[in-house]
A protein has these predicted regions:
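Peptidoglycan-targeting cell-wall enzymes and recognition modules
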Residues: 39-64, 94-213
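Phosphate/ATP-binding catalytic cores across multiple sugar-kinase/actin-like superfamilies
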Residues: 217-218
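N-terminal export signals and maturation junctions of secreted/periplasmic proteins
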Residues: 3-73
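A short alpha-helix/helix-coil micro-patch that ends at or immediately precedes a cysteine
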Residues: 70-78, 95
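Extracytoplasmic/secreted envelope proteins and their assembly/folding machinery
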Residues: 4, 8, 49, 65-68, ...
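Soluble non-cytosolic domains of exported or imported proteins
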Residues: 4-5, 46, 58-66, 80-87, ...
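Acidic helix/loop microenvironments that form the catalytic cleft of cell-wall polysaccharide enzymes
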Residues: 93-98, 179, 224-242
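Surface-exposed patches in mature extracellular/periplasmic domains of secreted proteins
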Residues: 77-89, 102-106, 221-233
Length: 242
């Protein structure tokens, strides 16, 4: 609930930082060195270092500079081109990645958290105790990933059909792109091999491209057009908890 309230607050605050779209196309004042301005619409042209600093307040200006061009280009390529959609897109990334500071899914769960978060239909109490974090025992994150994202559930929901797919295709990038199916579909969309994707989506360029692809391919552009962000969060991670 606190995360849901936080993202709503972030969404509202972020919307307040962007000026309304003018009735006529705004003239291009000066080309930005990070992208060809002529290829961006007015909303996409507002993506600069100042905007990213407001969108990702727990990161820093020096680190965020490298994300400006990738964000512009991803929004252009995938058609994220309205104020509401851009604000929702960035606000969701802010929550999903702790302000772009976490680009790889962590599975360092305690034994209790594994059952509480995923339920016994995804991991047994015995396996949670055996592989989860507890006093004197580190979490076995690779085994946890293969249990949570493997088996019949992983095959049906993530396309994880091979042994070890749960760990190999765990969440990476700003949208935590998870599963063989998602990463394969993204690879096809951008003309890369699926083997390249885990490393690629951890770069600013690949990360934002994957986030934009996920946003469009899962219909989040339509959900962003409705008030609030609940639908966005459910589509991204199955709930409003982060």
């Amino acid at each position: 609930m606190k995360i849901f309230q936080a993202i709503n607050a972030a969404h509202t605050a972020f919307m307040d930082t962007i000026k309304p779209v003018p009735p006529e196309p705004a003239p291009v004042i000066a080309p930005r060195p990070v992208a060809p301005v002529e290829s961006l619409n007015w909303v996409q042209q507002q993506i600069d270092i100042d905007l990213l600093c407001m969108a990702f307040p727990n990161n820093n200006r020096v680190n965020l500079v490298q994300w400006v061009r990738p964000t512009q280009m991803a929004c252009y390529r995938w058609g994220i081109d309205t104020i509401r959609e851009l604000s929702s897109f960035l606000a969701n990334i802010n929550v999903e990645t702790a302000s772009l500071t976490r680009l790889e899914e962590g599975l360092n769960y305690s034994t209790e958290a594994l059952i509480e978060k995923f339920g016994r239909h995804r991991i047994s109490i015995a396996d949670a105790n055996k592989y989860g974090r507890k006093a004197g025992q580190k979490a076995n994150q690779e085994v946890i990933a293969n249990i949570l994202y493997g088996g019949a559930w992983g095959a049906k929901n993530l396309g994880n059909t091979q042994p070890g797919d749960g760990w190999k295709f765990k969440g990476y990038g700003p949208k935590q792109l998870t599963g063989r199916a998602n990463q394969t579909d993204f690879a096809v969309a951008i003309g890369k091999s699926v083997e390249e994707i885990p490393a690629y989506v951890r770069t600013p360029e690949g990360g934002m491209m994957s986030a934009g692809w996920f946003w469009k391919s899962h219909g989040l552009d339509a959900k962003a057009a409705t008030p609030g962000v609940k639908d966005d969060r459910i589509a991204i991670n199955g709930g409003t908890f982060g």
